[in-house]
């Protein structure tokens, strides 16, 4: 790859340690993706702000960047939602020690880098945020919304890779930045009428749950959705893309919304009234919720207005109701009198935070009700591990005000015994036994920034993707995800072999925390390039290799003693004979 003078200066450290680390990471990702050039970006959006998600790994990494006085972002960069509303912290009743102080520390560290502290997961709703051209955005809902409805072109960046691009001003030219890779690969035909934004949220999430192992979708499912009205509201479109992003959808097309690239369909799905009602039935609360949360992603002005109208003349007395929004939208809501309506009812209107990144106090929050499948997806995960139900907005408000009560037609939820739900659906795989005798060598590639190495160690193997955020214990390296074939097993100190990571774009910070606590894998081997594992490995020198044949996962099994060796650009791995 030919570098320009600016890029060579960054690589040589002439613009400081932070940009040197960042350009190395960008070049590693470029090489891994077979990108032949770097292209300038117009904007960046960073995930990894709440101590709940970024954790110790994020805080220590930001402290490392702070040691460089030249560390500054090179393009307009916005910040994702934080873990609390600092001004209403006491009202949120967060019991996690030092959470407020750590939140302030993280936001201040980003601000020193020149990041605009918007603390919003909806940058596309801000008037002066660039939503056109090449970009490096993390935060899955923002990626899908921007790619689908605006002129933005961004890959599904991790928090670390987006930060590296923000510091350098460049990103590798590959993936969804190439129009040839933005074609729809799945057709979804909707045969029922959808109206409430929650209907669209359920549709988006449902699409992701249908994914099959046979689908060839290197950049995730990109559905073409037919059968929807041509005049969808902002809130309906937002709910659709936010939930579709739960399972890695970076972009979608609406059939009646203008030109699109030629389709290359892998499958055809039908979503009708039966599917919609089945999801509502499965998601409805079986017992009274402890808390109702609205605004995931953060509520637009239209959503705030809808909540305020539902609350007019009512009092929130039965179940606490929290409405989450951005500081920009809250300011507008104050001017329109909507904020007063919400507060007068007894509900909270919170800013700068989002339901999925709050550490709820389990002594009183035992069951959450929401109108968002994005909130449901993450709140029930290992981040909080709370039973989460879903209903339409009007139903949520009616329960909060006591107009509707939950029928006890099934036993009450018991959170202490509730399993952590899997974010990966219909897994049919398991820890695979060895199927070959003797020694077989597999070949892959390594990161350009890492030199030659030879390691031997115990293998940890699974043929299912690993969701680091929420499903890997940060203190032990143990996978804690019911239904995952490696549930209960630790990666710490082992050569971890798996297809790739999945889930949140904040995942690299979990891997960094494992490294800082000395419970990270000895090395990571992926059959596919992993945008979640590779950035952390690049920055801290954890040996990383990718691009191996899938048969590797069938030949080596957990507990085998293996050797991984890098010579030049090639990495080999083999099972050592007993």
Task: Annotate each predicted stretch with a short phrase.
Residues 406, 410-437, 578:
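Short, basic, low-complexity termini and linkers enriched in Ser/Thr/Gly/Pro
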Residues 290, 420-422, 493:
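Generic secretory/membrane-interface signal
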Residues 290-291, 425, 563:
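Solvent-exposed, well-ordered amphipathic alpha-helical segments
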């Amino acid at each position: 790859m030919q570098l320009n003078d600016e890029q060579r200066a960054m690589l040589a450290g002439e613009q400081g340690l932070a940009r040197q680390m960042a350009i190395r990471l960008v070049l590693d990702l470029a090489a891994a993706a077979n990108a032949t050039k770097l292209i300038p970006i117009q904007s960046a959006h960073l995930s990894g702000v709440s101590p709940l998600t970024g954790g110790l790994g994020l805080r220590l990494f930001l402290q490392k960047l702070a040691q460089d006085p030249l560390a500054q972002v090179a393009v307009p960069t916005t910040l994702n939602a934080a873990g609390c509303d600092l001004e209403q912290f006491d009202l949120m009743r967060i019991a996690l020690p030092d959470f407020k102080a750590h939140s302030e520390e993280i936001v201040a560290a980003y601000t020193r880098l020149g990041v605009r502290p918007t603390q919003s997961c909806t940058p596309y709703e801000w008037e002066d945020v660039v939503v056109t051209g090449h970009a490096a955005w993390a935060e899955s809902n923002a990626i899908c919304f921007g790619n689908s409805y605006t002129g933005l072109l961004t890959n599904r960046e991790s928090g670390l890779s987006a930060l590296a691009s923000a510091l350098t001003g460049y990103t590798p030219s590959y993936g969804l930045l190439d129009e040839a890779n933005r074609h729809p690969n799945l057709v979804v035909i909707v045969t029922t009428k959808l109206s409430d934004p929650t209907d669209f949220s359920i549709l988006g999430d449902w699409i992701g749950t249908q994914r099959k192992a046979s689908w060839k979708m290197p950049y995730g499912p990109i559905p073409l959705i037919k059968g929807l009205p041509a005049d969808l509201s902002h809130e309906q479109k937002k709910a659709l893309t936010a939930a579709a992003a739960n399972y890695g959808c970076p972009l979608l097309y609406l059939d009646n919304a203008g030109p699109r690239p030629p389709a290359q369909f892998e499958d055809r799905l039908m979503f009708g009234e039966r599917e919609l009602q089945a999801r509502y039935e499965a998601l409805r609360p079986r017992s009274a919720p402890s808390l109702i949360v609205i605004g995931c992603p953060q509520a637009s002005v239209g959503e705030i207005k809808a909540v305020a109208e539902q609350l007019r003349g009512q009092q929130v007395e039965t179940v606490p109701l929290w409405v989450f929004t951005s500081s920009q939208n809250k300011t507008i809501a104050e001017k329109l009198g909507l904020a007063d309506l919400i507060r007068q009812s007894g509900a909270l209107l919170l800013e700068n935070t989002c339901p999925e990144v709050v550490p709820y106090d389990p002594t009183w929050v035992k069951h959450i009700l929401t109108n968002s499948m994005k909130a449901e997806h993450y709140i029930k995960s290992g981040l909080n591990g709370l039973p989460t139900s879903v209903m339409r907005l009007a139903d949520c408000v009616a329960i909060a005000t006591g107009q509707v009560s939950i029928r006890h037609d099934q036993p009450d939820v018991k959170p202490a015994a509730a399993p952590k739900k899997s974010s990966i659906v219909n897994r049919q795989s398991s820890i695979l036994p060895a199927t070959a005798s003797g020694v077989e060598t597999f070949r892959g590639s390594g990161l350009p920034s890492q030199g030659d190495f030879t390691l031997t160690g115990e293998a940890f193997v699974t043929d299912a993707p690993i969701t680091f955020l929420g499903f890997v214990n940060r203190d032990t390296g143990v996978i804690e995800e019911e239904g995952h074939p490696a549930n209960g097993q630790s990666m710490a100190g082992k050569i971890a072999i798996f297809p790739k990571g999945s889930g949140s774009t904040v995942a690299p910070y979990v891997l960094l925390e494992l490294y800082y606590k000395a419970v990270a894998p000895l090395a990571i081997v992926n059959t596919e390039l992993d945008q979640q594992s590779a950035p952390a490995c690049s920055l801290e020198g954890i040996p990383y290799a990718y691009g191996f044949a899938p048969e590797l996962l069938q030949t080596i099994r957990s507990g085998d003693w293996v050797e991984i060796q890098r010579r030049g650009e090639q990495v080999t791995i083999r099972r050592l004979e007993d």
